[in-house]
A protein has these predicted regions:
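A beta-rich soluble binding module of mature secreted/lumenal proteins
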Residues: 16-171
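Sec-dependent N-terminal signal peptides
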Residues: 4-14
Length: 171
């Protein structure tokens, strides 16, 4: 009977497994060029940001090599209440600065993979192997419609379902 219980428990756990893949990152990130403000133009959001408008992620390299991050957005509408979060980024050694651990709450560090970065450091896609969240960000508040479609399709090509994909209005 105990073996049967273990079998059903394992079956239950595997049935609840999160879809996962190995997201490919860019070869290298010049961390100093990556710092600064990024407008979040589209995402598959976490619970905290599901109603975000005017979302901006700002990065500043600390002397110790960690990354001070400020994530600001209006909740619910373009003029909704301002929400601000200050996670801390930690570059994972051996990744050429393309994989970070993003810490909102100690000691948990969420995976943050720079999956796309144009050569001008003006557009980036940050993804996760769990395929649960993704962020399309740019140095400008908008991109032409054809580029938005191109990057949405790129995200889908990484293995993401677009069911919860959402473009973010910027003012």
């Amino acid at each position: 009977m105990t073996v049967l219980k273990h079998f059903f428990f394992i079956l239950l756990l595997t049935g609840c497994a999160v879809k996962s893949t190995q997201i490919k990152t860019v070869d290298e990130v010049d961390i100093n060029r990556f710092m600064g403000d990024w407008y979040v133009l589209a995402h598959i959001p976490s619970y905290v940001e599901k109603n975000a408008f005017n979302a901006v992620e700002s990065y500043k390299l600390n002397e110790d090599g960690s990354i001070a991050t400020t994530f600001t957005f209006n909740e619910g509408s373009l003029d909704g209440p301002v929400k601000t979060y200050h996670p801390k980024g930690f570059i994972i050694p051996g990744t050429n600065n393309a994989v970070w651990g993003m810490q909102f709450v100690w000691p948990i560090k969420a995976q943050y993979k720079i999956a796309y970065l144009d050569t001008d450091y003006k557009i980036t896609i940050v993804a996760r192997d769990k395929l649960d969240y993704v962020w399309l960000m740019a140095r400008t508040k908008t991109l032409p419609h054809d580029q938005m479609i191109k990057f949405r399709d790129m995200i889908k090509g990484m293995g993401y379902s677009l069911d919860n994909y959402r473009e973010i209005e910027q003012e």
